[in-house]
């Protein structure tokens, strides 16, 4: 198998939920879920953390992830796009490990509801379809062809034109959940968008839709994890 790099990007300055990446959900720090899922997938020799926080780095190392650089300030503010952060982690990892990774898989630290099986199936889809990159999503609960609107000149207009009278008749749409990103090395180095001519989509269970950006998100995810009642070996 070609060597795959796993990255988990977790900055310390979260505004919506303070210290969310190391806040505990059912006795485990949130970032621990992604680290353990990566380990359980058996896809990776290296699980690398990109962070600007010494506290996050310490917690991540406790669970077996590797932290050998500190993310620079210009890549750690709330306006920084994620692709440059992943690209930085890839190049630093290649220099550190003296190897060239063919593929990078990034796991969002604030999306703990995925499983190791999700990671494996997403990678299998990526390989089978020979995608340049892959994003994950869930079936959308709202549809721009049917029940999403915009305001233009103080009037309501449909987000997408179309004569669809039921949700079932409208084109299927998907809500990106930011849980898993997969890139071929060359694509990541040469592009600044996740939308390319050969981008794949892996559809996940709707329960994985929650990316923790608010206290409400945190409470919902905490409840869903408690319902599953999983131990780390089941992640």
Curated annotation (Swiss-Prot):
CDD domains named in the record: CMP-NeuAc_Synthase
EC number: 2.7.7.82
GO molecular function: N-acylneuraminate cytidylyltransferase activity; nucleotidyltransferase activity
Listed Pfam families: CTP_transf_3
InterPro entries: CMP-NeuNAc_synthase, Cytidylyl_trans, Nucleotide-diphossugar_trans
Domain of life per record: Bacteria
GO BP term, pick one: bacterial-type flagellum organization
Catalytic activity of the protein: N,N-diacetyllegionaminate + CTP = CMP-N,N-diacetyllegionaminate + diphosphate
Keywords: Bacterial flagellum biogenesis, Nucleotidyltransferase, Transferase
PANTHER family linked to this entry: HAD SUPERFAMILY MEMBERS CMAS AND KDSC (PTHR21485), N-ACYLNEURAMINATE CYTIDYLYLTRANSFERASE-RELATED (PTHR21485:SF6)
Task of the protein: Involved in biosynthesis of legionaminic acid (5,7-diamino-3,5,7,9-tetradeoxy-D-glycero-D-galacto-non-2-ulosonic acid)(Leg), a sialic acid-like derivative that is incorporated into flagellin via O-linkage to Ser/Thr. Catalyzes the conversion of N,N'-diacetyllegionaminic acid (Leg5Ac7Ac) and CTP into CMP-N,N'-diacetyllegionaminic acid (CMP-Leg5Ac7Ac).
Family: Belongs to the CMP-NeuNAc synthase family.
Name of the featured protein: CMP-N,N'-diacetyllegionaminic acid synthase
Organism: Campylobacter jejuni subsp. jejuni serotype O:2 (strain ATCC 700819 / NCTC 11168)
Gene: legF
């Amino acid at each position: 198998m070609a060597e795959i790099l796993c990255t988990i990007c977790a900055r310390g300055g979260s505004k919506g939920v303070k210290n969310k990446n190391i806040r505990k959900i059912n006795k485990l720090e949130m970032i621990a879920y992604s680290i353990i899922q990566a380990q359980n997938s058996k896809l990776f020799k290296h699980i690398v953390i990109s962070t600007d926080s010494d506290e996050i780095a310490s917690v991540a190392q406790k669970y077996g992830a590797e932290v050998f650089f500190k993310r620079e300030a210009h890549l750690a503010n709330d306006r920084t796009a994620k692709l440059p952060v992943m690209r930085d982690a890839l190049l630093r990892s290649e220099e550190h490990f003296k190897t060239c990774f063919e593929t990078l898989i990034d796991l969002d630290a604030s999306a703990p509801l995925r499983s190791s099986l999700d990671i494996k199936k997403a990678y299998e889809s990526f390989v089978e379809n020979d995608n340049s990159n892959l994003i994950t999503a869930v079936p959308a609960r709202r549809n721009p062809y049917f029940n999403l609107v915009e305001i233009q000149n103080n009037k309501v207009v449909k987000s997408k034109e179309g004569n669809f009278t039921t949700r079932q008749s409208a084109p299927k749409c998907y809500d990106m959940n930011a849980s898993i990103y997969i890139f071929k090395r060359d694509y990541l180095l040469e592009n600044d968008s996740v939308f390319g001519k050969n981008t794949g989509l892996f559809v996940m269970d709707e329960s994985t839709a929650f990316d923790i950006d608010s206290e409400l998100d945190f409470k919902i995810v905490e409840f869903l994890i408690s319902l599953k009642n999983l131990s780390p070996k089941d992640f």
